[in-house]
């Protein structure tokens, strides 16, 4: 019996020692010396002390981060408490602070070592230490949020304030020293000894591997299958989503309270609409039972890959102390003060004023607003270097609005076809149900290439890696969040399957099969047909749209079905295989599965808008043959040049028409000559624009 207790104490000691070693390695490898100094000052200047242990509680954390909480100076910011995310964030950090020993140490007291691990994990700096660890935090984040199927979290956190102090090795009041471990979350207690290790947390394995401590992981961190049985309550996820949406534009060292306080009722209503839309994507059963790991993992990995990005600038606040004065003179050995070395100021450096992401000057949007933009930033990437829209300082330029420019394809082509950069198409309209009730819906598409009638793309071998910023995306953001990611092999599709297609006869088609135009094709044979995981068709009057979503694959196509991400498919030739589930979307254009269930929405268009994407100045460069950067010409300047060219061509056509003669037959002959030359008519958009 004594031997067993000794072995248990040794194992506990090993776990504590390894946890501290990992925190030390994170501190030295993932932070600069200056950042670590600021982190220490922020932590210890606010820390509470008990039995010689310095730690933070929920109120201190919420107050420092500026997160609305149920108590303290960061108390409820909204009357309904939807932004009271303090308890949610504190639960997360109490779990993450125990990494990689969540089974036996979580929830942990938020000591300085625990805070180091929290900041590293939530700002994704762990890649500097965990070289072989996959940058995939989904399981870790799920475990930190799961609160259904666990022992009462509030009671457990209170117990942890005492039990974990003793587990660190502090002598108890009755004498002696003990390593009485906190029991950990109930769902995290190790069971299922004989299970495969394929489901082990990749980050935890990499952390233990970096410390040469895999055996400790196998003994003390056996994979716990009950983590897949626990769930996140709807209230917890709703509060987190609300916080993430309102703080999505937060920049490093930005003021959090700017986004979490003073929100108008209309702004909060819009936030709640987007939160409800995301929750609706999980299904109706979530409201009763909570969010399971499978649903959570699929939602994040396939349609919200950048959802947790706002946590990075939020926790980077810990790496700058407003109290720290590094310019103080230091005394030398002879008592003389040295000249102060140039050091960073004790207040955040003033950066040049940033223009808003949504640029003004073209039209007042009826669809796009800061809340919608936050939602879009969770799944649209505009740069392979810095995916997040707010982090890479992308700007959105107003290109076309049906309200401002009219419901005309001529106007659409004038504004959109001349925009030589990626665009985001947004449509707001109504879907009429069977009982004649109208449901407002908002759909859209991300088009990474310039629009043109005859689609041609730069050649790319299918074996080359792709980034989401280079792939198109079809989506619905209200009333049910739905994202159809672009297929990694879309550039190798046939020429009759472009990402976007424009025709004055049939309208606008996105992700459709375009029938060949011939004299024999009549009527419906000329209309584009849905393909792949989904398609969007807009009539030539810009009055009606058809949004088609397939549960399977309507043959090969531009878009994957919902619930499938480009990284979750393997590309071989023209076939795409879905790896996450047993439902394979492998199909060819000639063998469309009749069992595929298509959902078709017929939408009466209220507003249609196109927004042009302008990358930041630092990202809008490319290298020449010598490696020197070459500035790309601004998309706005290119469009204006195209408009000037079209104006000159219009004047030239008018002069030619006048020379042809005033007779009707002569005018028709002149027009025919101009059409044959490609100067007027539909064919003018087939050629590449002149510069």
Swiss-Prot record:
Listed transmembrane segments? none
Q: What is its main location?
A: cytoplasm
Q: Which residues form the TLDc domain?
A: 366-614
The UniProt keyword set, sorted, is:
Cytoplasm
Q: Which domain of life is it from?
A: Eukaryota
Residue ranges annotated as compositionally biased, kind Pro residues, are 341-355
Q: Which GO terms describe its cellular component?
A: cytoplasm
Q: Where is this region: Disordered?
A: 329-355, 559-595
By its UniProt entry, which InterPro entries does this protein fall under? TLDc_dom (IPR006571)
Q: Name one Pfam family in it.
A: TLD
- UniProt subcellular location: Cytoplasm
Q: Where is the composition biased (Low complexity)?
A: 561-595
Functional summary from the UniProt entry:
May be involved in a process influencing telomere capping.
Tell me its family.
Belongs to the RTC5 family.
Name of the protein in its database record:
Restriction of telomere capping protein 5
What is the organism field in this record? Blastomyces gilchristii (strain SLH14081) (Blastomyces dermatitidis)
